[in-house]
Amino acid sequence: MTRKTKRKGFIQTLDGNTLAMKLIASIIRLEDLIIFLEGKGRQVSYAKLSDKEGRTVADADACTDAVINSDSFINLGKGNHVRCSTIEAVETCNGQDHKGILIRGEGDAILSFLPISQLEAREKVAEALHDALVSYEAGKFVQPDLTKILSTH
């Protein structure tokens, strides 16, 4: 099913809501879920995927593609994306329980977390994300190849 847009810049999400695409700051894909967050980390759309028309994996992919094609999004892998313009900070987390990269938005809201167990890989991913944000700010966005970085560690 193709995502229907009633007006340019808007999208009908899998949960039936119509949202301005510029509102969506983060796309989180889990096994059978698709979640959209806005810049302050609040959930604006949540849908459980199934075989039902309008809620399939293909529908989620089409919805994701429509949103990420509307602006510059960093691809974090596994269907997760974050809008460049909403990223306020990229932090490495070296905690005992959680190790990875935290991406923060407005008011320190967590927009995404990328689990990475190895310190060297965390540092390289953080550097790649920083470089991507610098390229975005310069008007020449370059998508970081996080898959390549993570596959070598």
Please describe what each predicted stretch is.
Residues 2-17, 22-81, 85-153:
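Acidic, Ser/Thr- and proline-rich intrinsically disordered linker/docking segments
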